[in-house]
From Swiss-Prot:
HAMAP family: DHO_dh_type2. Binds 1 FMN per subunit. This is Dihydroorotate dehydrogenase (quinone). Signal peptide: none annotated. Its EC number is 1.3.5.2. The keyword Phosphoprotein does not apply. It comes from Mycolicibacterium vanbaalenii (strain DSM 7251 / JCM 13017 / BCRC 16820 / KCTC 9966 / NRRL B-24157 / PYR-1).
């Protein structure tokens, strides 16, 4: 059924249909009786899927990745739609419009998206107000980025301001230094640049702090960031963001679309490689959140047994529809029982042991 609906959706420009569908999801879940009925059908209720991470109970491991709900206006909806948590943002200390449109594109032959949104958001202060006013049935993480006009030498203060405003309201914070759509942002992934940023954020909040990294980093850089995260006492790493690589794409005319990051199956292989490398490096000293190209329960299971405590998806939701999260949750529960695990935490990293 969703395949036919998706065909209709894909006749509309991507950013416009995102706005319409997102508004529809929010409206449909505003009334508590409707939200409860949806949650009974879609939410992860099976106790085998639940785990405690950062001292917070997550009813299921699959969360909505940052980028879908940038300003936290849909936090009431995500639990009822099957997600065990959601990460809002990316938000910046100052409001900004992002890059000019068009800035979001479909790559249908690859079941992928290309975006160069540029951290369009209403600012950390507005998100803080929104989170104060709105309740959620599931944990809400917040992804923070650098304001575009802030020079790199003042990046630490910029991130720290967002952490100050949002830390008390978030289950966890993610420092995003890996989007390809803000000029110079990925340069902040070098250990020399990253150390003062992470230190400033950690000094500003007691909320668990993670860093989100790019799939395009060299293996040595991944190792250095992992070591820095352990040294500074970060809670974990989110791996990975979108890729700038165009290798192996089946959709014609991608180069004509211009720059941007690609999400979905084209990043899956590298995201899994990075996850495995990180787990081999840090083991259970850091929480690893795996994102990038997760489409099926098999994909999700492979990430769990490779070391991910939590998972995220966005592009899979776009292509998979409203039952996508439920299907993955049901598949994970079946695999956990089939392999003799009594809970999700037992399976994390089991393929590496």
């Amino acid at each position: 059924m969703y395949a036919a609906l998706r065909k209709a959706f894909f006749l509309v420009p991507p950013e416009r249909i995102h706005t319409w569908v997102f508004a529809g999801l929010r409206a449909a879940t505003t009334a508590e009786p409707v939200r409860r009925r949806l949650a009974r059908r879609l939410a992860p209720h099976d106790p085998i899927l639940a785990s405690t991470v950062f001292g917070t109970r997550f009813p299921g491991p699959l969360g909505l990745a940052a980028g879908f709900d940038k300003d936290g206006i849909g936090v009431h909806a995500w639990g009822a739609l099957g997600f065990g948590y959601a990460e809002v943002g990316t938000v910046t200390a100052q409001a900004q419009p992002g890059n000019p449109a068009p800035r979001l594109f479909r790559l249908p032959a690859d079941r992928a998206l290309l975006n160069r949104m540029g951290f369009n958001n209403h600012g950390a202060g507005a998100l803080a107000v929104q989170l104060t006013r709105t309740s959620s049935d599931v944990p809400i993480g917040v992804n923070i980025g650098k304001t575009k006009v802030t020079p790199p030498e003042h990046a630490a203060e910029d991130y720290a301001e967002s952490a100050r405003l949002l830390g008390p309201l978030a289950a966890y914070l993610v420092v995003n230094v890996s989007s390809p759509n803000t000029p110079g942002l990925r340069d902040l992934q070098s250990v020399e640049s990253l150390r003062p940023i992470l230190s400033a954020v950690l000094a500003e909040t007691s909320t668990p702090v993670l860093v989100k990294i790019a799939p395009d980093l060299a293996d040595q850089d991944i190792d250095e960031i992992a070591d820095l995260a352990v040294e500074l006492g970060l809670a974990g790493i989110v791996a990975t963001n979108t890729t700038i690589s165009r290798a192996g794409l089946a959709t014609p005319g991608v180069d004509a679309l211009g720059p941007g990051g690609i999400s979905g199956p084209p990043v899956a292989r590298r995201a899994l490689e990075v996850l495995r490398r990180l787990y081999a490096r840090v083991g259970d000293r850091l929480v690893l959140i795996s994102v990038g190209g997760i489409e099926t329960a098999d994909d999700a299971w492979e990430r769990i047994v490779s070391g991910a405590s939590l998972l995220q998806g966005y592009t899979g939701f776009v292509y998979g529809g409203g039952l996508w999260a439920k299907d993955i949750n049901d598949g994970l529960a079946a695999r956990l029982r089939g392999h003799g695990f009594s809970g999700l935490a037992e399976a994390v990293g089991s393929a590496a042991r």
